[in-house]
């Protein structure tokens, strides 16, 4: 029996108890959320993980993606990136390799973390076809489902599966065109395969069979966003919305079968369309957990896309997004290194917190920081910081002669002066 079926029968599982304690909500709140499809807890019968709940009424979670490319296959570096992401405070990891030995890389990454791990099975299926037969268009449908099951048995907790890329979606895309092209690797692979073979997407055509695999291995379905915009000028277009409609329908079907479901959202969205996207996706999916890929809010800042994404992620979280995929400074430029992974996670965690200050009224940490600064309590400030080591490092590198002040103001520290004046008035 799946965790969804347990929840429907009124059973509060150990996982629900753990997440309720983490989030400061009742155990029945979590149970009802899972039963209704508004909360998920990615689990696996094959490995124990640090549990996290994703969905309505819970803290916004951050995903850290790692993985090789065809140009850079360094398994040790990917393991370091996993560790860097976890050290920076990521809630989940996605392993998205496209180069090297897929099974070995995924196994190493899974073994390196206590966090829930996600994957995109079609990457391996299409790339193995290209290696064996010369092109992704030769991918065999049976291999796609076989690889999905193999990845589940490795202990994968959730999978991004591009169920909404079908003939109707492609027709919308072809009629309309795009300024920024098709940026989803999974969407591009499927588009090429479908057009060459004149066949429907097997993940859509055989959706019930896919769900049987996911349910058997208790894998959370994340409905992949193959038609997401790759440029802000393409945001919220017909192809994206068509895919959302299909994914929302299939998400309902999967949940009815006892599978936990996350709905993926777009990746390049201008600020004035973020609220629209979040509300539309929440409405159409029945308030299922919403996974925003960034989003990037302007296309002109390569090298700083972690900051660009943080702007979009904060607003997304504020309006109801539940899950944020981080973006690194290397986005659109290169495969990130461990340091860039760390920075990307920190940027996204800041954004998630900023959103939760509004969405969940979570402001206690900020209030405590205000008091610590007023009181010139540096140790408390470090402990309250989202990255204590970074805050401590900067202060120590440029320490003031006055232990209470910092080198920004030195002898003329406004807080110190004001505190003395107020004390005299008292």
Curated annotation (Swiss-Prot):
Keyword annotations: 4Fe-4S, Iron, Iron-sulfur, Lyase, Metal-binding, S-adenosyl-L-methionine, Thiamine biosynthesis, Zinc
Cofactor remark from the record: Binds 1 [4Fe-4S] cluster per subunit. The cluster is coordinated with 3 cysteines and an exchangeable S-adenosyl-L-methionine.
Transmembrane segments: none
Cofactor(s) for this UniProt protein: [4Fe-4S] cluster
Name of the molecule in the record: Phosphomethylpyrimidine synthase
Keyword Metal-binding in record: yes
Positions bound to Zn(2+): 268, 332
Biochemical pathway: Cofactor biosynthesis; thiamine diphosphate biosynthesis
Keyword Zinc appears in the UniProt entry: yes
Record GO terms (molecular function): 4 iron, 4 sulfur cluster binding; carbon-carbon lyase activity; zinc ion binding
Gene Ontology BP annotations: thiamine biosynthetic process; thiamine diphosphate biosynthetic process
Reaction equations catalysed: 5-amino-1-(5-phospho-beta-D-ribosyl)imidazole + S-adenosyl-L-methionine = 4-amino-2-methyl-5-(phosphooxymethyl)pyrimidine + CO + 5'-deoxyadenosine + formate + L-methionine + 3 H(+)
Role played: Catalyzes the synthesis of the hydroxymethylpyrimidine phosphate (HMP-P) moiety of thiamine from aminoimidazole ribotide (AIR) in a radical S-adenosyl-L-methionine (SAM)-dependent reaction.
Family: Belongs to the ThiC family.
NCBIfam families from the UniProt entry: PRK13352.1, thiC
Binding residues for [4Fe-4S] cluster: 406, 409, 413
UniProt-listed Enzyme Commission number(s): 4.1.99.17
Residues annotated to bind substrate: 94, 123, 162, 184-186, 225-228, 264, 291
HAMAP family for the chain: ThiC
């Amino acid at each position: 029996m799946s965790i969804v079926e347990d929840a429907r029968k009124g059973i509060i599982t150990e996982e629900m108890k753990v997440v309720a304690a983490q989030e400061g909500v009742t155990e029945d709140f979590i149970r009802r959320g899972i039963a209704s499809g508004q909360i998920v807890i990615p689990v696996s019968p094959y490995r124990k993980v640090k549990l996290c709940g994703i969905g309505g009424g819970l803290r916004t979670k951050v995903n850290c993606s790692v993985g090789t490319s065809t140009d850079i296959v360094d398994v040790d570096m990917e393991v370091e990136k996993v560790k860097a992401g976890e050290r920076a405070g990521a809630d989940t990891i996605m392993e998205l390799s496209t180069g090297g030995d897929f099974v070995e890389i995924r196994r190493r990454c899974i073994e390196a973390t206590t966090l829930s791990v996600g994957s995109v099975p079609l990457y391996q299926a299409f790339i193995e076809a290209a290696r064996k037969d010369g092109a992704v268009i030769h991918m065999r449908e049976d291999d796609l489902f076989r690889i999905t099951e193999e990845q589940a048995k490795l202990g994968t907790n959730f999978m991004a599966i591009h169920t909404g890329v079908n003939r109707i979606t492609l027709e919308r895309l072809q009629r309309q065109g795009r300024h920024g092209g098709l940026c989803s690797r999974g969407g591009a692979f499927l588009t090429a395969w479908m057009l060459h073979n004149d066949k429907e997407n097997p993940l859509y055509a055989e959706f019930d069979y896919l769900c049987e695999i996911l349910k058997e291995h208790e894998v959370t379905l994340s409905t992949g966003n193959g038609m997401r915009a790759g440029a802000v000028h393409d945001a919220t277009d017909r192809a994206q919305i068509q895919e959302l409609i299909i994914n929302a329908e299939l998400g309902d079907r999967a949940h009815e079968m006892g599978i936990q479901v996350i709905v993926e959202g777009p990746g390049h969205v201008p600020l004035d369309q973020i609220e629209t996207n979040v509300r539309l996706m929440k409405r159409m999916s029945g308030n299922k957990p919403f996974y925003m890929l960034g989003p990037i809010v302007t296309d002109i800042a390569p090298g700083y896309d972690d900051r660009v994404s943080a702007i979009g992620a904060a607003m997304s979280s504020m309006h109801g997004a539940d899950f944020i995929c981080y973006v690194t400074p290397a986005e659109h430029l290169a495969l990130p290194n461990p340091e860039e992974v760390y920075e990307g996670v920190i940027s996204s965690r800041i954004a998630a917190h900023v959103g939760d200050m509004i969405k969940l009224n979570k402001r206690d940490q900020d209030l405590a920081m205000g008091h610590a600064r007023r009181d010139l309590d540096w140790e408390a400030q470090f402990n309250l910081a989202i990255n204590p080591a970074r805050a401590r490092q900067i202060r120590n590198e440029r320490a003031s002669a006055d232990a209470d002040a910092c080198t920004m103001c030195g002898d003329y520290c406004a807080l110190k002066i004001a505190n003395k004046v107020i004390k005299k008035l008292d």
